[in-house]
């Protein structure tokens, strides 16, 4: 209380000062300070009073010096001293023009003791108003609008003026002084001052009050002392508000008034604090936005841009160590919740490089939705520089690319404000100051200390200069140290040795620490060096380091004070480049403008957990700066006293967010490039410029007028253009009450037109002016009050300006009221399509030395998985290069290369990407991949690797369309092709790489030896002739040779010419060892040679040594070695304590021999001889001992003809251990190490204890401390003697020592891991797709380990195993938080189990019949139909080729079903074609169907032969017709060819003379020419004939009436038939009817009959029946047997009626579709009604975390959306979604019940002992089970054996009645139940996994709904992945019960998916 009273008294005493400060802008304080300093040399006091101001104002000494100018320009990044004299005079500077008249505080109008704020403001305004005439005069001189005006302590104003014009200002009447504006830095974060944030705080009192900023990042520590509000009374989000939200959302909670809401979306819990040890990214971001620290030390508190704003902790990065990325669903959930809870701004300092702008991207769509709700989105641009900067990721282009963009997604979002990074002017960093207490002071200088633990390690130590042999400062060699270094700080210079080695040597010399002096000769601090953290070390700049060396040299015995602390120092990077070198370049790949704006992001000091702070750099730091600034802007809009409040209040949605963005961009300040003559920094790098928060707020308060491009964007996007004159329009909006006129800035630098250039020396990108280019307005810019004006501008380029360049710059407009508007523009002069999408082989990016091979083919060995660069050779200069003629692989399984793929270096983002294999004629063999888009290649700094596009591999097989089988392609030349459209373009580009498929090995002949004398030495060569007719001999010329068993695996051959028949003569030099092994006789030679496809020829031959004529004995391997040990080639041990030594050789006759044993006794060798090859083999037993032996070889058995004698030593005595002890004989230990001791025999050379080499003393004793891990440790000890013989002993030691009880303390079975677990219906054994339940088992490390999953404690069994279940449903990404602890320790760690699944296969409905063959004579066949899925991604393959896919980065939790319309052409082969159509969803569930098509080329058939029954006069004539070939059908026409019908088997009965046409047709649609047959022999008017004609017409009339009444034909033709019938009846009724008239009437009526058009054509019928089958299968028996109350029929019966109607053809397709839609609407309603009825209100009104709505709302929305759809397939997809929702709701209901207390009457347990949960509600699938893994109960009315979900159509068939005729079971042993009755959908299956029977009569051979998968598949990035095993191959008809397995479960996403899932890539 005393303190409060004291504060109150101070407030009262200082009311005058405070009153002044309440209205006094910071700018006026700065102005007064500048005047005071430059006129008197004194600084402004901390408290400004009228008295001190008066004292300063009376000092009239103005000091306008060069130093003052230089200081001001330096703050703007301009080096004044580098300007020439003309530039120094022409440059503009900021000055304060002080008036002669006194300011308000001195002119007597205010009381000196007290004046109110209102009085002060009133008098100040009068003073400012009186400045008008002087301002006008000043503006005439400066040509600049006057800036800020002052009137209280200073009477004056600021302006810009050229230096040369300053004296002119002083001459103007009324001007007292002209003073250079002082560079003013507050003690707060320098970044705030860069953007004029403090001025907003002071001038407008805006600090973010009443605003909320969402921080979508890695988390916030809400307990940090700077996470506070000064006053929490008037916050936007109260605790009550948050609790209302969380009650509905069912996640998240309230933390405090500063952080009112938070949730961990990644781990699905309320832990919002980032537990990353090194740095907390989200906490740093939060501090920049809204930290509210107190205190004067900038290192110990932080004040953010909007310190009074509230922050939402939307944690989207997991605390799990398994992932450092996040995924789409997680981000989307956080974005949506941010908007729902009412965030004004959301910040995302995250992204993936080089994004696009498609709203198919779920994050971009979510950002758009947030904008539409009025939440502004601010996103970082990325930290990757340009794509042309190789591994550096900076502002460079080494490749000369036209497309260098790297702006990341979701920062590419159109509505987001995307932020680039500028460097901070100063940096708080670790700095060193070195003093001696008297004359020395070095620093403070920025350093990088090896560890924070060593801050005191250098203080008060003596220093030691390490000198080299020349007496100069050493580079730190160990030999340069002396004993004097001990205990001192060593000083060395940079170079030669690694930093690590320098540290090691200093430590080894006994030094106490190390200082490394840089060698670049500058004062640049030495940071960013790789130091180990175990030895005290830092670096110094060259300048400071040399001063230290000089001082120590003069004072070697001084102990120096070394203070290492945090300090604010100038940022060296700011002096090199105002922009951060890492900030990502724009534009978006479609030439849309990005980034939007720049903010400080380089070297920013901000908050960390636990009241900590740190320095970080990145656009991640720039983005929150803008987010905070937009909170201030939003506060200004909410200010009811703002004169424009009424306008602002009506801004909603995107109108609001776009306005905020536009105002900030219009008021931004473009940054100049200090390294290139102060030209502009490219708008593609800085956007609109550096944010000026004060200017933006000024605009909102005074004149919120704006200028935008014609499309409404606050930047002009010229796109690409080719005309040198480009017109565009700008829209000016005047929101004031007075007319405004605008003039373009007259500054030629500002308004110049620029293009991009590259510094040839450094590769740095910069902008340069385009000489002769200009932009001019088409008219004066006048904007009436409250109106808009659209003005046309023309950009003119010189005719000489080359195309394929960017054109860019800034348009600056000065308003008539002094306001300014800034607008960047950017376009591409040329054709954006033209830039290459792929780098070529050996292209611009190819740099093997740097590890970048650019675009390169990859060859793979299937067996090992090893990949090789294809065609890689070494040129004459030793450089690696790709020879495109040497790229080949083999279809031979024994070859090394079995597959080919391409690793592409994509130079651009591309869309509609397709990868094909073409044959030698350019025909497509297969399509390996089709994808919507692929990202360009770039270097990822985090993973330290290039992100290429790895296209799928081809293994040389193809789909044989003739029979549907996979075949091996023929050998030959092929092409690997990629094609795509550059994003933003419209022209497809193609890039081809030729290769060969070659399965035949080269042929080799005439293997021989040759010799040459080279340098006085005989060099032997192995020669041969070789030939390969396709891929060619190995281009690397690698070969393997063996001479007499001496091998050279690294040989190479040279070409020595070519034979007449095309063989290449090759020579391979022998190695010295091989040459020594040669003898005068039969030398065995082996040549192993491959072709480029890796087919190998291994050729053996006997060769004669050149020049030799004798055939001596040759022993292979160069003879018997001097020593035979266990490592000798040819020795083989046996089990009797010895072994056998075997050797071989050649001799022209049999060889015999003897050897001596260990006792010296002689024995015969065991020899064999092969006369055909003159080769022998001999063997001798040897014993485990050391002894000398002799071997003699003879030419005879009598041993009289000695051929060769060998002396050798047998060395097989292994070393021995004596007194070997492990852990002193104990099997257990509780220590971290155990001791292994023992003694070895004297001949032992080495002893290895595990990986440690033991030291042996003189007595051969050893002792080793061996580290052990918790659990069983097998310790191996191996002794090795000099001969290589070894002895090994081992023992298992069990250790209870565990330094980290929690490390690896939990392991899971069946492949489950912490982090993401992705699977489908068949790939995970732990998951049951029928129930959606996952059973997770595993083991803990300790009995004391505790495990909590999803907030529930998991019981641990005595054997340390555990088991628990999770309800995963059938679709979605579901994270479960995991907490692992130990009862003996007071600590835990967090992890996450995330499951990403889709357990439902897609549906596939084809319009063509899949049951009966299709015949056609058109080679172009169209496959049409529809595929649906429960998620939004589908890919389509036809005949094994990937032909279509949808946007792969989906939000799997969106609940939106997928839909794909299929319309794909296929080129038919003549004869039979089996077309396989497969659709695959996001988790590789696949459904496959086959269409069999027979095609014959169109041809003209031979005309049929027509034969009359008689040619004599007759009453009737019967015409029969025969086709010329079998399989043809003859048709006839009685109406002149208008209509045709089949000739009846009995022929055509003719009753009247006339002409009849006949033609032949076949199944393929071919026809013959029509032949006419004229009947003339009918007797006219014969009574009998007349009666016959009447009868025939009567019959035909009756038939016509029957047809009319059938209802099968459309109205038009039925009406025509009725008219023809009436006409025929009239003719029949005529009394004078003749045969001719009756015949004519008959003919006309027959024509009308023939012209009847069926209501349901055959193709429509087939398609509809297929569709009805899919619907019926989807309903299953459960839902199908329910009754539609409106009809009283079951849904199955209703579908059966539709089938009958379709079969009957009595309704049109549209009518049937309408009826089907009604049935589906009724099904949807019934299902929704059932779900809602079975859902208690407390659950139904609860929130579905995935959608944010209640379960009841989800049900209603899905029902409404489904019923609103007009398409039956869409309704089916919604039905699936509703069924999924039912599963999820049921799970929620079950979760609300007490576990294990079910009261179900039918739940049973097959294993016994378990009490089932309650019986399901009507319509539910029995799902209850007892404990201990009981089987599903039989509760519910769905069959207890629901059908499986995978099948093909190959093995099971059905007869025409739908009966199963040949069902089989892959699992075997199971007896299937009887086939279902006709019309039923077969669902029963045999025991032990038998397949479901097929059945059902819709159609006769029901198509399957899922399919098999192959062993190898490709992922979404085209990568070959390991196969998951083939699915069952028997035919299955899949039943989909309503609650059985068709659900599309939509789970909340808090999981961990890397944004690289977009890089499915990447």
From Swiss-Prot:
Q: What is its main location?
A: secreted
Q: Name one Pfam family in it.
A: Gram_pos_anchor
Composition bias type Polar residues, residue spans: 1856-1865, 1890-1903
Annotated motif LPXTG sorting signal, positions: 1927-1931
Q: How does it sit in the membrane?
A: Peptidoglycan-anchor
State the Gene Ontology terms under molecular function: serine-type endopeptidase activity
Which keywords fit this entry according to its UniProt record? Cell wall, Hydrolase, Peptidoglycan-anchor, Plasmid, Protease, Repeat, Secreted, Serine protease, Signal, Zymogen
Q: Which residues get removed as pro-piece?
A: 34-187, 1931-1962
This one is known as PIII-type proteinase
**Provenance organism:** Lactococcus lactis subsp. cremoris (strain SK11)
């Amino acid at each position: 209380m005393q303190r409060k009273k004291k504060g109150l008294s101070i407030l009262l005493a200082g009311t005058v000062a405070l009153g002044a400060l309440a209205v006094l802008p910071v700018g006026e304080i700065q102005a007064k300070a500048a005047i005071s300093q430059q006129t008197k040399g004194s600084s402004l006091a901390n408290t400004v009073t009228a008295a001190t101001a008066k004292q300063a104002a009376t000092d009239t000494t103005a000091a306008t010096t060069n130093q003052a100018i230089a200081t001001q320009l330096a703050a703007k990044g301009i080096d004044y001293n580098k300007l020439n004299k003309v530039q120094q005079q022409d440059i503009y500077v900021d000055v304060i023009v002080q008036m002669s008249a006194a300011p308000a505080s001195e002119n007597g109008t205010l009381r000196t003791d007290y004046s109110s704020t209102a009085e002060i403001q009133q008098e100040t305004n009068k003073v400012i108003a009186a400045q008008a005439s002087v301002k006008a005069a000043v503006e005439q001189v400066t040509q600049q609008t006057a800036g800020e005006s002052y009137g209280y302590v200073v009477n004056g104003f600021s302006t810009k003026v050229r230096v040369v014009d300053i004296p002119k200002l002083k001459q103007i009447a009324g001007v007292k002084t002209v003073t250079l504006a002082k560079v003013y830095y507050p003690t707060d974060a320098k970044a705030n001052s860069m953007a004029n944030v403090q001025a907003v705080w002071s001038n407008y009192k805006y600090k973010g009050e009443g605003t909320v900023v969402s921080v979508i990042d890695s988390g916030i520590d809400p307990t940090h002392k700077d996470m506070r509000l000064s006053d929490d009374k008037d916050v936007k989000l109260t605790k009550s508000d948050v609790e209302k939200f969380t009650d509905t959302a069912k996640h998240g909670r309230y933390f405090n008034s500063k952080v009112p809401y938070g949730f961990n979306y990644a781990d699905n819990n309320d832990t919002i604090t980032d537990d990353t040890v090194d740095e907390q990214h989200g906490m740093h971001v939060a501090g920049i936005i809204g930290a509210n620290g107190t205190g004067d030390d900038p290192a110990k508190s932080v004040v953010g841009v909007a310190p009074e704003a509230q922050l939402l902790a939307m944690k989207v990065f997991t605390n799990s160590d398994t992932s450092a990325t996040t995924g789409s669903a997680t981000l989307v959930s956080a974005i949506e919740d941010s908007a729902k809870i009412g965030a004004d701004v959301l910040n995302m300092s995250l992204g993936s490089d080089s994004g696009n702008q498609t709203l198919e991207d779920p994050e971009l769509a979510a950002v758009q939705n947030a904008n539409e709700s009025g939440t502004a989105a601010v996103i970082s641009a990325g930290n990757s520089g340009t794509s042309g900067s190789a591994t550096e990721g900076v502002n460079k282009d080494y490749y000369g690319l036209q497309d260098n963009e790297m702006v990341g997604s979701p920062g590419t979002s159109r509505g987001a404000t995307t932020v680039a990074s500028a460097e901070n002017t100063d940096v708080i960093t670790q700095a060193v100051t070195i003093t001696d207490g008297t004359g020395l002071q070095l620093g403070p200088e920025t350093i990088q200390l090896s560890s924070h633990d060593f801050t005191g390690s250098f203080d008060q130590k003596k220093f030691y200069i390490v000198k080299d042999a020349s007496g100069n400062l050493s580079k730190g060699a160990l030999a340069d140290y002396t004993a004097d270094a001990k205990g001192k700080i060593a000083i060395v210079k940079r170079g030669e040795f690694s930093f690590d080695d320098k540290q090691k040597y200093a430590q080894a010399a006994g030094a106490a620490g190390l200082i490394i002096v840089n060698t670049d000769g500058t004062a640049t601090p030495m940071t960013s060096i790789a130091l180990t953290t175990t030895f005290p070390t830092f670096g110094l700049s060259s300048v400071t380091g040399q001063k230290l060396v000089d001082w120590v040299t003069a004072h070697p015995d001084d102990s120096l004070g070394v203070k290492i602390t945090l300090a604010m120092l100038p940022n060296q990077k700011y002096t090199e480049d105002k922009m951060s070198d890492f900030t990502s370049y724009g534009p978006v790949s479609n030439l849309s403008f990005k980034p939007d704006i720049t903010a400080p992001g380089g070297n920013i000091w901000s908050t960390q957990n636990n009241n900590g702070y740190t320095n970080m750099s990145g656009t991640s730091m720039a983005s929150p700066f803008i987010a905070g600034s937009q909170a201030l802007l939003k506060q200004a809009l909410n200010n009811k006293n703002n004169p424009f409040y009424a306008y602002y209040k009506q801004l909603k949605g995107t109108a609001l967010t776009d306005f905020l963005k536009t105002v900030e961009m219009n008021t931004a300040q473009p940054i100049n490039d200090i390294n290139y003559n102060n030209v502009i920094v490219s708008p593609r790098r800085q956007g609109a410029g550096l944010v000026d928060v004060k200017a933006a707020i000024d605009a909102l308060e005074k004149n919120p007028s704006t200028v935008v491009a014609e499309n409404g964007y606050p930047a002009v996007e010229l796109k690409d253009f080719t005309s040198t004159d480009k017109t565009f329009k700008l829209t000016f909006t005047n929101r004031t009450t007075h007319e405004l006129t605008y003039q373009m800035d007259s500054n030629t630098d500002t308004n110049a037109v620029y293009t991009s250039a590259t510094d040839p020396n450094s590769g740095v990108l910069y902008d340069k002016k385009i000489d002769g280019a200009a932009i001019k307005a088409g008219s004066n810019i006048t904007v009436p009050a409250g109106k808009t004006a659209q003005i046309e501008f023309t950009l003119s380029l010189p005719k000489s300006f080359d195309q394929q360049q960017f054109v860019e710059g800034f348009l600056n407009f000065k308003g008539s009221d002094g306001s300014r508007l800034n607008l960047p523009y950017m376009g591409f002069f040329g054709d954006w399509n033209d830039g290459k999408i792929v780098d070529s082989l050996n292209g611009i990016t190819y740099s093997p030395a740097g590890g970048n091979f650019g675009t390169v083919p990859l060859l793979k060995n299937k067996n090992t998985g090893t990949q090789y660069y294809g065609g890689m050779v070494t040129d004459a200069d030793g450089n690696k290069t790709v020879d495109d003629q040497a790229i080949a692989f083999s279809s031979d399984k024994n070859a090394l290369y079995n597959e080919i793929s391409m690793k592409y270096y994509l130079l651009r983002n591309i869309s509609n990407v397709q990868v094909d294999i073409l044959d030698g004629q350019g025909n497509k063999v297969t399509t390996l991949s089709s994808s919507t888009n692929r990202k360009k290649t770039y270097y990822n700094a985090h993973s330290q690797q290039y992100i290429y596009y790895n296209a799928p591999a081809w293994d040389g097989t193809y789909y044989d369309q003739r029979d549907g089988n996979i075949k091996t392609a023929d050998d030959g030349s092929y092409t690997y092709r990629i094609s795509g459209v550059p994003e933003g373009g419209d022209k497809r580009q193609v890039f081809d790489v030729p290769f060969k498929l070659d399965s035949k090995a080269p042929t080799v002949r005439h293997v021989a030896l040759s010799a040459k004398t080279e340098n006085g030495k005989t060099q032997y060569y192995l020669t041969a002739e070789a030939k390969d007719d396709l891929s060619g001999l190995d281009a690397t010329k690698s070969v393997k040779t063996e001479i007499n068993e001496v091998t050279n695996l690294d040989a190479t051959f040279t070409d020595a010419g070519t034979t007449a028949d095309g063989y290449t003569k090759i020579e391979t030099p022998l190695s010295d060892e091989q040459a020594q092994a040669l003898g005068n006789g039969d030398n065995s030679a082996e040549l192993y040679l491959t072709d480029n496809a890796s087919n190998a020829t291994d050729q053996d031959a006997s060769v004669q040594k050149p020049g030799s004529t004798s055939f001596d004995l040759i022993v292979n391997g160069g003879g018997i070695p001097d020593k035979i040990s266990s490592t000798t080639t040819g020795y083989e041990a046996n089990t009797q304590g010895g072994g056998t030594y075997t050797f071989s050789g050649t001799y022209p006759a049999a060889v015999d021999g003897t050897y001596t044993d260990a006792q010296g006794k002689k024995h015969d060798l065991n020899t064999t001889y092969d006369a055909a090859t003159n080769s022998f083999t001999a063997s001798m037993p040897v014993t485990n001992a050391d002894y000398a032996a002799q071997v003699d070889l003879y030419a005879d058995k009598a041993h009289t003809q000695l051929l060769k004698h060998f002396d050798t030593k047998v060395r097989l005595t292994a070393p021995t251990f004596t007194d070997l002890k492990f852990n002193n004989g104990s099997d257990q230990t509780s220590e971290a190490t155990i001791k292994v001791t023992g003694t070895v025999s004297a001949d032992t050379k080495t002893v290895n204890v595990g990986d440690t080499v033991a030291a042996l003393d003189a007595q051969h004793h050893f002792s080793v401390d061996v580290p052990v891990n918790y659990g069983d440790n097998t310790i191996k000890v191996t002794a090795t003697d000099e001969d290589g013989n070894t002895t090994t002993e081992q023992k298992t030691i069990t250790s209870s020592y565990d330094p980290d009880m929690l490390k690896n303390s939990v392991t899971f079975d069946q492949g489950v891991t912490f982090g993401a677990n992705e699977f489908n219906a068949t790939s995970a054994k732990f998951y049951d797709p029928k129930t959606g339940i996952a059973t997770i088992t595993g083991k803990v490390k300790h009995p004391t380990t505790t495990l909590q999953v999803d907030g529930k404690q998991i019981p641990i069994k005595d054997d340390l195993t555990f088991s628990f279940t999770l309800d995963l449903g059938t679709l979605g990404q579901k994270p479960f938080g995991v907490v692992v602890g130990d009862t003996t320790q007071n600590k835990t760690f967090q992890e996450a189990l995330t499951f990403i699944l889709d357990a439902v296969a897609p549906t596939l409905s084809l319009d063509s019949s899949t049951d009966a063959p299709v015949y056609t004579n058109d080679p172009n066949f169209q496959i049409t139909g529809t595929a649906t899925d429960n998620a939004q991604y589908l890919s389509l393959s036809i005949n094994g080729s990937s032909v279509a896919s949808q946007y792969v980065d989906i939000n799997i939790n969106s609940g939106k079903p997928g839909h794909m319309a299929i319309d794909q052409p296929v080129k038919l082969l003549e004869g039979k074609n089996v077309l396989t159509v497969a659709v695959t969803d996001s988790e590789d569930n696949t459904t496959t169907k086959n269409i069999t098509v027979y095609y014959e080329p169109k041809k003209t058939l031979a005309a049929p032969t027509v034969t009359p029954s008689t040619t004599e006069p007759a009453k009737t004539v019967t015409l029969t017709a025969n086709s010329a070939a079998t399989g043809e059908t003859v048709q006839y026409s009685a109406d002149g060819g208008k209509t045709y019908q089949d000739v009846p088997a009995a022929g055509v009965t003719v009753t009247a003379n006339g002409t009849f046409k006949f033609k032949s047709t076949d199944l393929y649609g071919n026809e013959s020419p029509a032949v006419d047959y004229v009947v003339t022999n009918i007797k006219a008017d014969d009574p009998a004939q007349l009666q016959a004609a009447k009868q025939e017409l009567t019959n035909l009339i009756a038939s016509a009436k029957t047809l009319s009444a059938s209802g099968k034909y459309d109205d038009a033709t039925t009406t025509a038939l009725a008219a023809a019938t009436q006409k025929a009846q009239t003719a029949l009724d005529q009394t004078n009817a003749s045969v001719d008239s009756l015949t004519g009437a008959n003919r006309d009526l027959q024509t009308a009959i023939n012209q009847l058009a069926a209501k349901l054509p055959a193709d429509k019928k087939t398609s509809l029946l297929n569709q009805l089958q899919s619907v019926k299968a989807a309903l299953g028996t459960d839902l199908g047997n329910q009754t539609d109350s409106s009809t009283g029929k079951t849904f199955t019966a209703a579908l059966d009626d539709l089938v009958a109607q379709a079969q009957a053809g009595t309704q049109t397709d549209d009518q049937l579709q309408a009826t089907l839609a009604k049935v589906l609407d009724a099904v949807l309603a019934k299902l929704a009604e059932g779900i809602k009825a079975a859902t208690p209100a407390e659950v139904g009104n609860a929130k579905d975390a995935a959608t944010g709505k209640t379960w009841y709302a989800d049900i209603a929305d899905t029902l409404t959306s489904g019923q609103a759809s007009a398409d039956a397939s869409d309704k089916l997809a919604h039905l699936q979604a509703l069924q999924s929702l039912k599963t999820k709701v049921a799970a929620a209901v079950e979760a609300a019940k007490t576990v294990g207390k079910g009261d179900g009457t039918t739940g049973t347990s097959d294993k016994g002992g378990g009490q089932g949960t309650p019986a399901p509600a009507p319509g539910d699938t029995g799902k209850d089970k007892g404990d201990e893994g009981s089987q599903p109960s039989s509760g519910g009315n769905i069959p207890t054996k629901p059908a499986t979900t995978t099948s093909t159509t190959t093995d099971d068939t059905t007869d025409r009645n739908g009966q199963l005729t040949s069902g089989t079971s892959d699992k075997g042993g199971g007896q299937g139940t009887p086939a279902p009755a006709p019309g039923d959908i077969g669902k029963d299956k045999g025991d032990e996994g038998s397949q479901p029977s097929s059945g059902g009569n819709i159609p006769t051979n029901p198509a399957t709904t899922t399919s098999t998968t192959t062993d190898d598949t490709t992922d979404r990035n085209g990568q070959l992945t390991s196969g998951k095993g083939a699915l069952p191959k028997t035919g299955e008809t899949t039943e989909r019960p309503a609650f059985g397995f068709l659900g599309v479960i939509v789970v909340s996403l808090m999981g961990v998916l890397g944004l690289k899932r977009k890089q499915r890539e990447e």
